[in-house]
Amino acid sequence: MKLLHVFLLFLCFHLRFCKVTYTSQEDLVEKKCLAKKYTHLSCDKVFCQPWQRCIEGTCVCKLPYQCPKNGTAVCATNRRSFPTYCQQKSLECLHPGTKFLNNGTCTAEGKFSVSLKHGNTDSEGIVEVKLVDQDKTMFICKSSWSMREANVACLDLGFQQGADTQRRFKLSDLSINSTECLHVHCRGLETSLAECTFTKRRTMGYQDFADVVCYTQKADSPMDDFFQCVNGKYISQMKACDGINDCGDQSDELCCKACQGKGFHCKSGVCIPSQYQCNGEVDCITGEDEVGCAGFASVTQEETEILTADMDAERRRIKSLLPKLSCGVKNRMHIRRKRIVGGKRAQLGDLPWQVAIKDASGITCGGIYIGGCWILTAAHCLRASKTHRYQIWTTVVDWIHPDLKRIVIEYVDRIIFHENYNAGTYQNDIALIEMKKDGNKKDCELPRSIPACVPWSPYLFQPNDTCIVSGWGREKDNERVFSLQWGEVKLISNCSKFYGNRFYEKEMECAGTYDGSIDACKGDSGGPLVCMDANNVTYVWGVVSWGENCGKPEFPGVYTKVANYFDWISYHVGRPFISQYNV
């Protein structure tokens, strides 16, 4: 049976064949990941909303002035008008008591309400809504009702854990004279049902009306086969990792080895709804949900009367207005595959983020250009007392015959060592170099250099992903190399099996090949280990740090894990220089 589960997991990861049902929670979820209690506010796993930003792994509220200025006016429940939806949501994020009311200006009589009718308790019943510009209340259509809408409705009613996935509302025969109902569509993370899109539909009777049971902690005890959400809610383990946000805080979809049902599995271990694939919006932080899409699917709907604005479309529009950093995209793509140990030289343009750190003796280490005037490298490469002696050389592919017309030489203004760098253990082996600006210039000019992106999440790349290491290091016979070389290596899971307690999993990364045929070596230190996401955007995943017996089996190279230092880097260089997305 275990072999069967392993085979199914292989199909899910490599062939996206994930239409199976798992019998054990261990088959589905990563325990180490679950222990970190990720939710929809964990930017290691998900993108923050446009009115939030990522700080130390958590989506926190922006201030309203940090939102894009373009947009349509909206009204909040306190009758205050806001120039944009983003500004209203930003203030709501800071002060949760005030919610979205309607798109457009505020009116004295405008009111939105949600209530549950014909239930035995205040936590269950048929869902009835009064829209702002409608005179009467209407029931919600059952045909459009899902856990997304149910969770939002219950949250709007004050049930913080959303809807109950186990209990069902038993509806007896009712005499309701209504020929219409409201079709509602939510994304599932709205804080009020007013943010969802409503259209009017015809109905045949009360059987067509949506009902819900909201989750009440006192009414539920753990099941034998339960999954506990981060918010304290219990759901069946069979509802975890299926692409449906049953928990309401998304914690059941963020630590998944594979996906059940129709869920789409992101490499970062997140399950998203299958309809999010190829919908024009990147939902996987690794981007693969929008790769290979011929076009966006259009949905044909029956003739309806649209009653409210599409605020999810407005959210996407605001997201498109956020500044995006240009990094990690080369002007030319390499097509050859060479080894850094025993390989041939790189071509001009293959590695536009690679720099050489030179002192009086020659190239001592490599470095990575990350934008502005900033170079990322290894702390062990540098000495504070030699700051004025270092030079940064860019566009160097041949150290013996340098192309001086193309090479740009910059001098070092200052070096920032990680405050917890340990020269004995190589912990926190990372440093920043700020290059001097020429004259009165505001920035450094490196016309042929392209910055590598700085990763914000440790889940962007996984063991067995293929990445590239580069440098001017020695070959395995200790022979000096004078041309820039690069080679492909695979990320290797926890290297404690090779290096024991000298390997610190949180701040170190392992990469190489099990036969040692490709490796970084002496002289490559400080240089880049770069990985490309599904859209061929390059991230500096590691900084060459240390290793033993380069090019020998069972001695993979050890790198400083850059994602662990995103906040440290952004603190020193400024977040706009390294934040590719809204993070």
Curated annotation (Swiss-Prot):
Localization in the cell: Secreted, Extracellular space; Secreted
A single Gene Ontology CC term: extracellular space
Domain LDL-receptor class A: 213-257, 258-294
Residue ranges annotated for the Kazal-like domain, each copy included: 55-108
Top-level taxon of origin: Eukaryota
GO molecular function: metal ion binding; serine-type endopeptidase activity
Main location (coarse class): secreted
Quaternary context: Heterodimer of a light and heavy chains; disulfide-linked. The fully processed and mature protein circulates as a zymogen, and is allosterically activated by substrate-induced remodeling of the active site. Interacts with C3b. Interacts with complement factor H.
The protein's name in its UniProt record: Complement factor I
